[in-house]
Amino acid sequence: MSAAPTTPTASTPMMRQWERIKAQHPDTLLLFRMGDFYELFHDDAHIAVRELELVLTKRGKDANAVPFCGVPYHAGERYIAQLVGKGYRVAICEQVEDPKYARGLVKREVVRVLSPGTILEDSFLSSVGAAKGNNYLAALTANADFSRFGLALLDISTGEFLAGEIAGNRKETGNTQQALLQAPASDDSNRWSALREELLRFAPAEVLVPQHLRECSGFLELLQSLQLLTTAFDSTGFDEPRQKLLNQFRTASLRGFGLEEYPVAQEAAALALDYLQSTQLGALGHVRRIGLLATEEWMQLDNATRRNLELVQSLRDGSTRGTLLGLLDETKTGAGARLLKKWVLQPLLEKERIERRQEAVAEFLGNVLLRRDTRDLLKNIGDIERLVSRAVTGQGNARDLVALRNSLQTLPALDATLQHINAAAIAKVRNHLNPAPELLQLLEQSIAD
């Protein structure tokens, strides 16, 4: 049986330890590990009681009594998912030494900070509506006169990383920088329109806002109108943005990624990396490349068009039921679901690319047995992008490793099935199917079902 939660009073060494750690993470709900429980104190406790329907109690009867509540450690993921799903940042503070061997107070440290844009686990992703879609963390920067914005989008759950620059479309009115900072968004809607459309298109779960943008009333007004969760964050690294990206991707130039000539985009991308490294407290080894946010390849559909056509979201209840995506989505894998959503929102413009995609679809439409066999194999393939992301960041578990093993075991059979298709698009897919035999052998030897 688990021990009941114990709570330090304000004068105890444990409460002073909590106060020291809380001071380092003032904008989070601090889940403080005490034995078999996570406990929350003071204002954190009041918030948790309201949001999680817990019981508030106090330690002590005098004016220094400490309000607190707790949740069992083994059920922590469920409660954390609820808090993150409601937009809170949660710091996980663990006991980092065995209490049996501790000399005095057990050492505790924050091992991870969770927020809507930094989550990896399936239950957390479901809580923010990203089970079948991307979960982007956005980082925004701007040059001195707000004529160009840098936008970076990083999905830590898949490793996808995009960055680009957006013209501010500012009218040449002779405004000083101070006037620009103070002007509301409504004074010059053109200045923000392109940025607004990109934020609506990607719908990030969280937006990082550095100091120079936090001072701009029009920019803050824009984010508030979009009801986006914002996090104040400034780069804490010593490397300048370009060098930080070069270090991350282990390259001597960003030219191969298309970003060499976009310094504002580089700044936004570096900001996103800084934030994730500070919250995950570890390396981001699965983030191995970055792509340029290019719009020339797709038909540009503004938010009003996407909404009125009900491409991915119903006007009635906001779900996918009755939408084009809801009609088309028969995908069997997480990666397939994300890709289909992107295709629906980004229709191709180039005739040759459209025809290559149609050729591949026609192959499956014309061969019932091939289609059936391929779908049956895809059922055995997990969300490899997210499985690998959790493993690399140290957040994976035994179920993830079993799912990864099963997925890798299926790839040779999938490749053999697809070899009967002549379409160029499928040949390209086959070229990227890598069963990773050494990794598979390690998993098979290490896992006992």
What are these regions (language model features)?
Residues 2-363, 379, 383-392, 396-449:
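Charged catalytic and DNA/RNA-contacting regions of genome-maintenance
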Residues 366-371:
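Conserved interaction-surface patches within small, structured recognition/assembly domains
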Residues 375:
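Aromatic-lined, polymer-binding surfaces characteristic
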